[in-house]
Swiss-Prot record:
Residues 206-226, 270-321 are annotated as: Disordered. InterPro entries: Chibby_fam (IPR028118). Belongs to the chibby family. SPERT subfamily. Keywords: Coiled coil, Phosphoprotein. This is Protein chibby homolog 2.
Amino acid sequence: MSPLECSECFGDQLLHRTYTWQLTLHSRPNFTRKRDTRSESLEIPINVVLPQRGTAEPFPRLHNLHSIPRCAQQAALPRLSRRMASQHSYPLNRFSSVPLDPMERPMSQADLELDYNPPRVQLSDEMFVFQDGRWVNENCRLQSPYFSPSASFHHKLHHKRLAKEFVLQEENKSLREENKALREENRMLRKENKILQVFWEEHKASLGREESRPPSPLPQKDSASLEVVKKDHVALQVPRGKEDSTLQLLREENRALQQLLEQKQAYWTQTEDAAAPAEESKPAPSPHEEPCSPGLLQDQGSGLSSHFEEPRGPPAPQEDSKTLRALREMVSNMSGPSGEEEAKAGPGLPDGCQPLQLLREMRQALQALLKENRLLQEENRTLQVLRAEHRGFQEENKALWENNKLKLQQKLVIDTVTEVTARMEMLIEELYAFMPGRSQDPKKPSRV
């Protein structure tokens, strides 16, 4: 007998080594015939599978490697029945008990009446079965003619599938509950962020009011702004469009004021140029008489508003008239009662004092507008800071959610690994239970 290594029946993964012994059976010559004194021989290959790692015990196995009888006499040899073959095919000195019929296929699992489940391993979502010396996918495997699982095997497999489905449903349910809790936490954080924004705005508004108190207070405007701020705080909303609209209004007011100043300067230069030759031609007026220049308005009893209504200069367009009216109303509102008193006392003042008074009022209005503009810019900066903090909170929530998800996945992987190791140990114990008794217990294979 010469052992030959064979690795063709194991595919790509060499899990075992196969040794082949050539058994030669010699038949006695027939002495009844005097002439026929030849002896006949029959060669039968037997494969013995030895695992590479873990166990050192051989597993004799017969493969369908038998050749067709070479002659009629060889085919007419008596066949050994299966019942005469011993069930124990171990150790190697008992190969005579193995069925040596070359035309007979190896005994299947159903013939031996063994309830044996093949080894199974689950990787991710796929199940692999160890069949015919290799790991095969359970869904794509080919049914071997020597593999015939019993009804109990299918029953166990069905129960395992039901248990896996139940476990998956429980995991999905727990993940949904965790997702719901994270959403609630995110909603609460958003509410807290809004409340903090409101408190910050109130604090900034109070500080701005204390710093930007002009010498001429504006009680009406402050009360209106306070009411607007309170309404916004109750609603817990800080619309950005409103801020943009206020900034745009302030810019338009600044532009209108600049245009008004330019028009007044041009108007005053024209009046001065026209009044210079008139004063040279006319005698010096008495101190009780008021000089009447041709560029001034006829109706002097209307006070300061007369300069904004009907100037004798070139006719201004419709937009300039609208801006002038808006500026007149704004200056009158911001000047308050002092402006009304000055307007009442306006006709009694000389012409040189009226433009100075107007310049003072416009300067006060510009200062108030600049202070409001600064406050709005500071509020805009604080809003940007709060938005950045809100983004940071959102990123932290996202990181926490990802961490929890990774922890769940790690737990699932650990559970699956422990389950696979437990199943492998059970399978190894079953394999050793099917093997015959030995003098020494073999060592268990080391875990990979």
